[in-house]
Every structure is written in structure tokens, then in C-alpha cells.
């Protein structure tokens, strides 16, 4: 846990320091550095940014029950950044664990799906300024916690000791952490199914590992249904941002400029309030 906190703090210090430098000069115009940038040139021709997302991460992104459209905090924020640049976004529904490779291969211009800025991912792609910081949380049915005599667990290894199988979406950071800790893990291709199976009484999973505000969203949804889900484990986590290919420096710089403007003028905090995401 100490290692996770240390790494997270280093990443936060780097990205926040960069953010402060940009926000100090808020009205930054779109840039086009010298040299060829095929991704940005194509975006300029089409006026469209191709973005991949997995819409099973409420309140970051989800399908509207009425319209079927992809909506959510990150969706609204990315759309606002694009509008700031005189562009629009075409949203592509794609599995979470396929987004980074699709961005690297040029099939998508950007990934927007609650991506944490981790050291491993920084080797593969570049990230915009962070829009949020999160906590990692493992949640359980309160009835299960009571039956096992659990109030709070302090390490991931405690779940192994207590014989608790933890569900998680495949391909994300939490899966790696659980496996490294020797915890019995069950994976799903989307982020909603682990939570739904947890409350349905599926005996193959007794807990789910995800980040706030995703965990908070599900806890509140289940509470509305009279189902008590509680946090059994929590720890500080990584900041969250949008990602682009390392060959997309112009898109990255321009999106950072747009995002800095939206932080400065209060749009980001307004959207967080709208989607019930803490502003700290």
C-alpha cells in the first residue's frame, strides 16, 4: 500500500505542477507546433476527434436509458474541450481493455474511460491534464461483512486471508494489484457486471474493486433499491485523465489548453456538481 501511495503522490505532483503552470495563463490558444502531425492534420480536415470509451463506468460514462446515447461527466467534459477547439467528438463504444491499443495503432485519436495516470500507462501513451483524483475502494454487501465479522480491511492481502473472491473489470489496474497480492480474482469484460452479480447473490464473488466515484455511484443506486453495500477497503489512488498516442502531441497540447480554460472558468467544477463527483 505504501508503494501505491508513494507512486500516486509522485504522479500527482508532476501533473498538478504542470496544471498550475498552464492555469496561471488561462487563455491559451490552440497550437500547431512546427513539424508534421498526421493525427492533428486529419482532425483539422474532418473537424472530428475519434474517441473510444467503455460506457459502463457511471458517472464517468454510461448509456442514457431513454436515448441510448453515451453520456456522463467525462463525456460532457471532453465534448466541452472539443467545442472550445471548434471541433466535435465521435464517440466509439469499445471494450475498456482495447482502448489503449486502438489509440496506439491510430484507430482512435483519444481514450476517455476513467483512465488512471499510472507509471505503466505513461510508458505506452500520453495523458492530458488530470480532471479528477480518486480513491481505490473494495465494496461488499453489508450482510456479508457482518457474517464474516468484517468492519474494515487494511490491505489487499487481508482479502486473501479471509478467503474473499474479488470481482473486477478485466484489463484495469485493480486486476493487476489483486493478482500481485495473491487474491482470488474473478473478471468481467465490463465494469457494471461485477456490481450486479455481487448484489444478485452470485456465490462466485463476494466483493468488487473499483475507484470512486464509480463505487459511490453503485452504492447509492443499490441503496435506492434497499440493498446495503459498504466500503470494506479504501486507499489513495491515481489522478484520472484522457489519453492520446505519443504521436499526437498537437492534440495533447490543444486539449490541455482547452481543459485549463474550463478549469479556470469553473466549467469543470460545474460538471462535477452536476454528476455528483467530489471537487477535491
List each model region and its residues.
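Beta->alpha turn/N-cap motifs
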Residues: 52-57, 92-97, 106-118, 141, ...
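Periplasmic-binding protein-like
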Residues: 55, 133-137, 212, 216-260, ...
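Short helix-initiation/N-cap motifs at beta->coil->alpha
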Residues: 75, 90-101, 151-154, 171, ...
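A conserved helix-loop-strand patch within extracytoplasmic ligand-binding domains
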Residues: 87, 95-98, 115-119, 123-125, ...
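Extended ligand-binding regions for polar small-molecule ligands
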Residues: 29-34, 75-84, 141-151, 163, ...
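A ligand-binding cleft/hinge motif common to bilobed small-molecule-binding domains
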Residues: 98-101, 115-123, 177, 195-199, ...
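Extracytoplasmic small-molecule ligand-binding "clamshell" domains
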Residues: 35-114
Amino acid at each position: 500500500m505504501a508503494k501505491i501511495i508513494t507512486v500516486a503522490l509522485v504522479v500527482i505532483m508532476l501533473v498538478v505542477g504542470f496544471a498550475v503552470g498552464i492555469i496561471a495563463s488561462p487563455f491559451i490558444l490552440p497550437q500547431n507546433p512546427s513539424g508534421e502531425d498526421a493525427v492533428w492534420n486529419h482532425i483539422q480536415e474532418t473537424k472530428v476527434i475519434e474517441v473510444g470509451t467503455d460506457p459502463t463506468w457511471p458517472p464517468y460514462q454510461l448509456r442514457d436509458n431513454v436515448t441510448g446515447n453515451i453520456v456522463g461527466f467525462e463525456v460532457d467534459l471532453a465534448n466541452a474541450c472539443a467545442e472550445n477547439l471548434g471541433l466535435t467528438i465521435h464517440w466509439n463504444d469499445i471494450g475498456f481493455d482495447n482502448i489503449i491499443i486502438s489509440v496506439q495503432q491510430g484507430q482512435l485519436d483519444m481514450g476517455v474511460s476513467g483512465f488512471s495516470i499510472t507509471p505503466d500507462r505513461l510508458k505506452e501513451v500520453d495523458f492530458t491534464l488530470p480532471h479528477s483524483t480518486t480513491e481505490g475502494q473494495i465494496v461488499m454487501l453489508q450482510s456479508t461483512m457482518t457474517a464474516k465479522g468484517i468492519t474494515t480491511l487494511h490491505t489487499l492481502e487481508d482479502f486473501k486471508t479471509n478467503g474473499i473472491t474479488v470481482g473486477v473489470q478485466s484489463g484495469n489496474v485493480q486486476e493487476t494489484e489483486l493478482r500481485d497480492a495473491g487474491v482470488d480474482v474473478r473478471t468481467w469484460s465490463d465494469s457494471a457486471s461485477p456490481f450486479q452479480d455481487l448484489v444478485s447473490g452470485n456465490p462466485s464473488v463476494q466483493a468488487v474493486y473499483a475507484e470512486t466515484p464509480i463505487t459511490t455511484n453503485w452504492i447509492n443506486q443499490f441503496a435506492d433499491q434497499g440493498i446495503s453495500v459498504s466500503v470494506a477497503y479504501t486507499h489513495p489512488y491515481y489522478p484520472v485523465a484522457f489519453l492520446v498516442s505519443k504521436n499526437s502531441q498537437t492534440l495533447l497540447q490543444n486539449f490541455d489548453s482547452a481543459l485549463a480554460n474550463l478549469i479556470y472558468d469553473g466549467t469543470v467544477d460545474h460538471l462535477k456538481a452536476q454528476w455528483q463527483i467530489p471537487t477535491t
